[in-house]
Design a protein with these regions (language model features):
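Soluble non-transmembrane domains of integral membrane proteins
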Residues: 1-168
């Protein structure tokens, strides 16, 4: 299932397959086309290249079973609209009363300093008894960017993707 959320400056497509961001389109910027014309909206990355996977082990009786989130389909709640944002929430049930929850927040024009941001939060709901004595979760994240500028040198100089870990 695909979930589409838009604000004034971007369109974000989410997929319940793996609970991932499938694509991001910037509305106010254009990229150079094949003939040198600048009329195509900027796609931040090739949708087919969107790879995101959390891996961890859960207890299943006497065994530990590896979970790779990219191999599962999440269930999505309806998109919640607030005065300043739209919230996409997806859950992956792991056991009775236990789930992995992804929460994405796409801000709107009421918060212009955040309008190009997508906040992402992972919650382990009721999972402590199932977490197989581990203190960390593995993450694998990769995307292939489109070439949006004429020159490779300029593109490398001005392209940035950033993340922040809460508490840092």
């Amino acid at each position: 299932q695909e979930i589409v959320v838009e604000n004034d400056v971007m369109k974000v497509r989410f997929s319940t397959g793996g609970g991932i961001v499938r694509s991001v389109t910037l509305k106010d910027y254009t990229r150079y086309g094949r003939q040198g014309e600048r009329n195509e909206p900027i796609e931040m990355f090739v949708p087919e290249s969107a790879k995101f996977d959390l891996s961890f082990f859960i207890k299943n009786g006497l065994n530990n079973v590896k979970v790779n989130t990219s191999e599962y389909t999440f269930t999505a709640d309806p998109v919640v609209r607030t005065d300043t944002a739209q919230i996409v929430r997806m859950r992956l049930p792991v056991a009775e009363g236990a789930a992995l929850e992804y929460r994405y927040v796409v801000y709107d024009e009421a918060t212009p300093s955040r309008d190009y941001l997508v906040d992402y939060t992972v919650r382990l709901v009721g999972m402590a008894p199932y977490m197989a004595n581990q203190s960390s979760i593995g993450i694998a994240w990769s995307n292939t960017s489109y070439r949006n500028e004429r020159g490779f040198k300029n593109e490398n100089m001005y392209t940035t993707v950033a993340y922040r870990v809460p508490g840092e």
